[in-house]
Amino acid sequence: MAQHLLHGTLHATIYEVDALHTGGLRSAGFLGKIISNVEETIGFGKGETQLYATIDLQKARVGRTRKITDEPKNPKWYESFHIYCAHMASDIIFTVKDDNPIGATLIGRAYVPVDEVINGEEVEKWVEILDDDRNPIHGESKIHVKLQYFAVEADRNWNMGVKSAKFPGVPYTFFSQRQGCKVSLYQGAHVPDNFVPKIPLAGGKNYEPHRCWEDIFDAITNAKHLIYITGWSVYTEITLVRDSRRPKPGGDMTLGELLKKKATEGVRVLLLVWDDRTSVDVLKKDGLMATHDEDTENYFNGSEVHCVLCPRNPDDGGSIVQNLQVSAMFTHHQKIVVVDSEVPSQGGGSEMRRIMSFVGGIDLCDGRYDTPFHSLFRTLDTVHHDDFHQPNFTGASITKGGPREPWQDIHSRLEGPIAWDVLYNFEQRWSKQGGKDILVKLRELSDIIITPSPVMFQEDHDVWNVQLFRSIDGGAAAGFPDSPEVAAEAGLVSGKDNVIDRSIQDAYIHAIRRAKDFIYIENQYFLGSSFAWAADGITPEDINALHLIPKELSLKIVDKIEKGEKFRVYVVVPMWPEGIPESASVQAILDWQRRTLEMMYKDVTQALRAQGLEEDPRNYLTFFCLGNREVKKEGEYEPAERPDPDTDYMRAQEARRFMIYVHSKMMIVDDEYIIVGSANINQRSMDGARDSEIAMGGYQPHHLSHRQPARGQVHGFRMSLWYEHLGMLDETFLDPSSLECIEKVNRIADKYWDFYSSESLEHDLPGHLLRYPISVDNEGNITELPGFEFFPDSKARILGNKVDYLPPILTT
């Protein structure tokens, strides 16, 4: 049967199965007997039935009910689903299974042809359940379902941007959008005083950068009642204030000393740090994990700081195998700081306090402090002497010298009602995994800490509307509703037995669908939509990197090409994911990335051909990485030792170059809307039941790109980032949707790549933005950039390698 593109939202309800005669396909053949025997031997087989149903679009799993226990004949779920889709499919498939501790037993499948729903009519019917040979199962059971498909074109926000200040935010989410907020955006941990691009904003102002770690230092220093921190890693030995031109009282204290001091002053200091249980040797030796979790716990032992190492516990709904996967492979990845702070308008003498929060990509740990200059060698005797981070070379150390690994990252400070949502997230997580009930009871402080209220009037031109999004499940946060109906209204996805919040993915999908002119992304990873990958040496349905973001981006570009409207997507990723670039895990991730990009470029080139256009696909979708290269200066730090000869380390030191590690997790749409958080563009971050994540999405209602280009804080922030990456400002950068802009940015990045990769070096690199070193032909195939099979100074393949012995769940 012909496949159709389902691009939009599918509303589905699974009611019940009429009359099951259990046994299903279990007894079929030899394998069924083995499973039964194994179950009986280890005592699993005698239990009750645990029936659940799933929804697939072709071979992509898009929905699943909870389990119904001990209703073997007539399971009733009555569960509704709100499914974002961007899939080619001929059938919508409902599968009924009986769960057991090792896996699940197939009962049968029911098929609804996409032809029946594609026109948008509501379809409600009893559908026959079939076996693997498409024959009715024993007893001719049927499943009762309802479906209605809404194509993206029918969405009133499609291609419209944020139309007005009345835009309500992303629907079906746990946290609704908050008004009257204030947001500060940070490009990295620190911005020195000599980084001063002149970027005009609306109202005659110029953009002013903020300083993340200085602001966090001030927030912690000034807290009087509570300091709550979560991190993938928190390292007690770092200092937050390092700029000798901007000293602060107490700025030489380490983070650990500062937190202990605040706790002795009577402030409740609670830390939730991911308990790195992996010790999966395969990852450890690749340098992927070095979180200091045990050092941090030991440091605070016996102090008044409460530090809890929390593993990424699976929710109770998985099989034994799945639960082992979650606790061994996945992480707590949220990076937040929540404090009480003074109420600015009350003056210094007031006792009144409010809640302030920080959310983003920067962990409070080693290797994160950097500035927009991203020096490789010149800070090794100053701010990076005791914070030398270089996990991409075996045995790298300050005694052997640079290049250090520079760090590109993005963070935000949230004030107003939105800051309380970050607090609620912490309280939910502490209640689930923190152990003792020692959260500050804010109700008892209601005369001091003002309740969630706007920090700005809606009329104020600097005001923000902001919404909080997460990837998390009931294994990591308390307070999720039990009833499927209430969960569905809050946008929570029901799993077999767990409730999942995957609103970060929803927020990205929503923002991409709304986009009118351009999208700018910086992210540490870029892979997904594996249901649409070519079956080149893999079985795509085995990969399960099912999130929609890459496919949504390419379908948006295709739609604009078909309409003859201009639209551009710019993506910045690291050269390779942090770790030894030749290692199996890094090569596997690069392979997934190549497959993702190829899938997108094939969509784009096909659309161009269909319109008779012979254009470079990079004029629509373009990928970059960041790197730096510095000439040697007099008086530079001289290492006592040298790297081993003929190593990547030695070659990079001699060539005086290295990548700038892109750790950002950010998307800007049309210069009016921004998402900043901890979530990568991969399945781990977007799934909800894998890594736990948090993000904010916001806009300034007085600075929308409705009748004229947006010129608020989001625009200023993007221009400041481009100034950092390109080393210049240019008129054409004001309109990233124009052909002139994308051609100019591509041209500059191509030139900088030539400088970066050349044999000789006469000057510092004039900017950091480099083309991602791949070629795209006019059919969308991705091949090596001529002369570049390997990253400079390494033997690591740029296009990656398929690695069969690492399970995809680990690297996607």
From Swiss-Prot:
<keyword id="KW-0677">Repeat</keyword>
<dbReference type="Pfam" id="PF12357">
    <property type="entry name" value="PLD_C"/>
</dbReference>
<feature type="domain" description="PLD phosphodiesterase 1">
    <location>
        <begin position="328"/>
        <end position="368"/>
    </location>
</feature>
<protein>
    <recommendedName>
        <fullName>Phospholipase D alpha 2</fullName>
        <ecNumber>3.1.4.4</ecNumber>
    </recommendedName>
</protein>
<dbReference type="Pfam" id="PF00614">
    <property type="entry name" value="PLDc"/>
</dbReference>
<feature type="active site">
    <location>
        <position position="665"/>
    </location>
</feature>
<feature type="domain" description="PLD phosphodiesterase 2">
    <location>
        <begin position="658"/>
        <end position="685"/>
    </location>
</feature>
<feature type="active site">
    <location>
        <position position="340"/>
    </location>
</feature>
<feature type="domain" description="C2">
    <location>
        <begin position="1"/>
        <end position="127"/>
    </location>
</feature>
<dbReference type="GO" id="GO:0004630">
    <property type="term" value="F:phospholipase D activity"/>
</dbReference>
<keyword id="KW-0106">Calcium</keyword>
<dbReference type="GO" id="GO:0005509">
    <property type="term" value="F:calcium ion binding"/>
</dbReference>
<feature type="binding site">
    <location>
        <position position="333"/>
    </location>
    <ligand>
        <name>a 1,2-diacyl-sn-glycero-3-phosphate</name>
    </ligand>
</feature>
<comment type="similarity">
    <text>Belongs to the phospholipase D family. C2-PLD subfamily.</text>
</comment>
<feature type="binding site">
    <location>
        <position position="374"/>
    </location>
    <ligand>
        <name>Ca(2+)</name>
    </ligand>
</feature>
<feature type="binding site">
    <location>
        <position position="524"/>
    </location>
    <ligand>
        <name>a 1,2-diacyl-sn-glycero-3-phosphate</name>
    </ligand>
</feature>
<keyword id="KW-0443">Lipid metabolism</keyword>
<dbReference type="InterPro" id="IPR011402">
    <property type="entry name" value="PLipase_D_pln"/>
</dbReference>
<dbReference type="Pfam" id="PF00168">
    <property type="entry name" value="C2"/>
</dbReference>
<feature type="active site">
    <location>
        <position position="333"/>
    </location>
</feature>
<keyword id="KW-0442">Lipid degradation</keyword>
<dbReference type="InterPro" id="IPR035892">
    <property type="entry name" value="C2_domain_sf"/>
</dbReference>
<feature type="active site">
    <location>
        <position position="663"/>
    </location>
</feature>
<dbReference type="InterPro" id="IPR001736">
    <property type="entry name" value="PLipase_D/transphosphatidylase"/>
</dbReference>
<dbReference type="InterPro" id="IPR015679">
    <property type="entry name" value="PLipase_D_fam"/>
</dbReference>
<dbReference type="GO" id="GO:0005886">
    <property type="term" value="C:plasma membrane"/>
</dbReference>
<feature type="active site">
    <location>
        <position position="670"/>
    </location>
</feature>
<feature type="active site">
    <location>
        <position position="335"/>
    </location>
</feature>
<keyword id="KW-0479">Metal-binding</keyword>
<keyword id="KW-0378">Hydrolase</keyword>
<keyword id="KW-0472">Membrane</keyword>
<dbReference type="InterPro" id="IPR024632">
    <property type="entry name" value="PLipase_D_C"/>
</dbReference>
<comment type="function">
    <text>Hydrolyzes glycerol-phospholipids at the terminal phosphodiesteric bond. Plays an important role in various cellular processes, including phytohormone action, vesicular trafficking, secretion, cytoskeletal arrangement, meiosis, tumor promotion, pathogenesis, membrane deterioration and senescence.</text>
</comment>
<dbReference type="GO" id="GO:0005737">
    <property type="term" value="C:cytoplasm"/>
</dbReference>
<keyword id="KW-0963">Cytoplasm</keyword>
<feature type="propeptide">
    <location>
        <begin position="1"/>
        <end position="36"/>
    </location>
</feature>
<dbReference type="GO" id="GO:0009395">
    <property type="term" value="P:phospholipid catabolic process"/>
</dbReference>
<feature type="binding site">
    <location>
        <position position="663"/>
    </location>
    <ligand>
        <name>a 1,2-diacyl-sn-glycero-3-phosphate</name>
    </ligand>
</feature>
<feature type="binding site">
    <location>
        <position position="724"/>
    </location>
    <ligand>
        <name>Ca(2+)</name>
    </ligand>
</feature>
<dbReference type="GO" id="GO:0046470">
    <property type="term" value="P:phosphatidylcholine metabolic process"/>
</dbReference>
<dbReference type="InterPro" id="IPR000008">
    <property type="entry name" value="C2_dom"/>
</dbReference>
